[in-house]
Amino acid sequence: MDTKTQSLPNTHAQPHSNSRPQSHACHHCSCSQHCQSRSRSRSCRSRSSSRRPRSHRSPTGRQGQSPGPSPPLRRHRHTMHSHQCPSRPVTHSCSHSKNRKNLEGKVIKRKQVKRSKQVYKRKRQSSGRKYN
C-alpha cells in the first residue's frame, strides 16, 4: 500500500503543481487517522459493552438468583416511567392542583367541625362542673 500511495503523488506531481499532491497526500493521512481513530473508538466501545454484561452477570451469580432478576425489573420500570413522564406532568399537575384546592377546603371544614365539637364538649364539661 505504501509504495502505491507514494507512486500516485509522483505521477500527479509531473502534470500538476506540487501543492495538489501534497494536499492530496495529507488528506489521505487524515483519512487514515480518522479511520484508525474510529476503529479504536469502536473497539473501545465494543470492549466496554462486552465488559458491562460480564460485570452485571458476575455479581448476580455471586449474590444468588433472587437479587438477580429484581434489578432489571427496576430498570425497566424506570425506563417506562421516564417515557410516560413527559405526557403526564401537564395533566397530572392540573388535576393535582385542583385536588389540592378541594382537599384544602375539605380539611378546613373538618378542622372547623372538630373545633366546634371540642368547644361543645368543653362547654358541657364546664357547665357540668358548675352544676356539680
Curated annotation (Swiss-Prot):
Pfam families noted in UniProt: TP2 (PF01254)
Amino acid composition bias (Basic residues), ranges on this chain: 37-59, 108-132
Residue sites binding Zn(2+) per the record: 12, 16, 24, 29, 31, 35
Chain location of the short sequence motif Nuclear localization signal per the record: 105-113
PROSITE patterns: TP2_1, TP2_2
GO cellular component term of the entry, any: nucleolus
Compartments, as annotated in UniProt: Nucleus; Nucleus, Nucleolus; Chromosome
Transmembrane segments: none
Bias-annotated ranges (Polar residues): 1-20, 82-94
Primary residence: nucleus
Tissue: Testis.
Family as reported in the entry's similarity comment: Belongs to the nuclear transition protein 2 family.
Biological role: Plays a key role in the replacement of histones to protamine in the elongating spermatids of mammals. In condensing spermatids, loaded onto the nucleosomes, where it promotes the recruitment and processing of protamines, which are responsible for histone eviction.
Protein name in the entry: Nuclear transition protein 2
Organism: Bos taurus
